[in-house]
Amino acid sequence: MTLIYLLLALFAERMLSKPDHCHSNFYIDKYIDWLNKKSYLTQSVSTSGLSLMWLLPGLLLVAALTIVNVSIIDFAVTLFVLYMAIGCPELRNTYKCYLQAANQGDIDTCNIYTQQLGLGQLEPRTFGQHLIWLNYQRYAAPMIMFVVFGLFGVVAYGCLRTLHGYSQANNIHVQSSLSKVLHVLDWLPIRITAFGFLLVGHFSNALPKWVGFLFDTSTHAKLVLA
């Protein structure tokens, strides 16, 4: 059933236009706005409090589905959450605009789109690595989280990633604890994703490097994909 969910979600993500209310960030951003209005997200927030914030939405959703216990509702909600979590049309459209600017040789416009994709300035090698990282976050990570932790994992990972970005942007002092949790959660998915790239790339050349990272717990997840 897990495979069916993933295939249906990927098919829907590719075939259907995804409006704002069908993207996970739409709801997570509203959740963060609510936390701000209630003054829960402040500089004095504790590590345990911040942990509860990214765990709570997933726990509540799973609890609600368990209480309702109707198969068709469980199926529809699970599929919709996966559909929202997988992919990012805004990033895809930005990348298409970047390619158009690159084909026209417009370096200044390329730099603008590069910044929108999360990089400071255009560097071909770094840019390619960053695109791989974005695809991991939007596709591989939520799919693997769903396989390992179910619907709770998809929601919790999305909340954790967004709260981590928010805490970095606002210099919340416990952001380091979120970084450590993300590092642990990304450890297995990033190596599975890297192995997938091995199978479609230079397997014999890259395999020794992949094996070297296999039990490495210190290297940042983004560098493993590089």
List each model region and its residues.
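Hydrophobic N-terminal alpha-helices or hydrophobic patches in metabolic proteins across all domains
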Residues: 1-226
